[in-house]
């Protein structure tokens, strides 16, 4: 009987967590367009409609990954050093397109506007056994722990120089010990892994 009660309790908690995430996702996808053309508008909407900070961060990930397309022309126009022209958040919101630096900058700016500690991380990423020459993702501190997010690869992928929208959760709130398998920050401090 005790095992059945424990199994039921575990199932109930898991079901509630899934329902909460589904609810946050549904609300994030319905953010009014008028609130999405400036970081201040998005921050205000998120403050008023999502709580706690974990729900706000989830809403940021879901909204960005579903509303910002990968900017393939910008990818192809990078300079000789493989660098992109900086892309401020307001430009990303205006064009609804970005490369990884723009996705990450917008994510960090929204978190910062909400009082959530976040950092933009640059380094190498590996996807489909191919190492990217340069990539950007986000570190967010939640409840005293650091988690990593990649809204770029959470939005979809590029195939034959075309962006294919394909939202996924693989790159949402990834523990550092897992992220290090496919991501290497230029600054080792942003591994957030204790090697001692």
Question: Where are the language model's segments positioned?
Answer:
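Short, solvent-exposed coil/turn segments
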Residues: 18, 86, 131-133
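Low-complexity, Gly/Ser/Thr/Pro-rich intrinsically disordered linker/tail segments
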Residues: 169-196
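Bacterial Sec-dependent N-terminal signal peptides
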Residues: 1-22
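Short capping loops/turns at secondary-structure boundaries
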Residues: 12, 93, 97-100, 129-131
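A generic structural signal for ordered secondary structure
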Residues: 19, 42, 46, 139, ...
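Hydrophobic/aromatic-rich core segments of domains that either
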Residues: 102-178
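Secondary-structure boundary elements
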Residues: 21-99, 105-108
């Amino acid at each position: 009987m005790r095992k059945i009660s424990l199994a039921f309790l575990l199932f109930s908690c898991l079901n509630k967590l899934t329902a909460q995430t589904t609810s946050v996702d549904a609300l994030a996808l319905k953010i009014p367009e008028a609130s999405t053309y400036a970081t201040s508008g998005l921050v205000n909407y998120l403050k008023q409609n999502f709580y706690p900070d974990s729900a706000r961060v989830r809403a940021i990930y879901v909204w960005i990954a579903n509303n910002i397309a990968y900017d393939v022309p910008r990818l192809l126009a990078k300079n000789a050093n493989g660098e992109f022209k900086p892309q401020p958040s307001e430009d990303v919101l205006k064009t609804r397109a970005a490369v990884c630096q723009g996705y990450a900058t917008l994510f960090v700016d929204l978190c910062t506007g909400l009082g959530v500690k976040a950092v933009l991380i640059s380094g190498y990423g590996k996807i489909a056994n191919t190492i990217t020459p340069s990539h950007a993702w986000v570190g967010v501190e939640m409840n005293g722990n650091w988690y990593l997010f990649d809204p770029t690869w959470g939005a979809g992928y590029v195939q034959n120089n075309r962006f294919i929208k394909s939202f996924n959760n693989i790159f949402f709130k990834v523990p550092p010990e897992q992220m290090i398998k496919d991501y290497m920050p230029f600054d080792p401090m942003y591994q957030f892994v204790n090697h001692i």
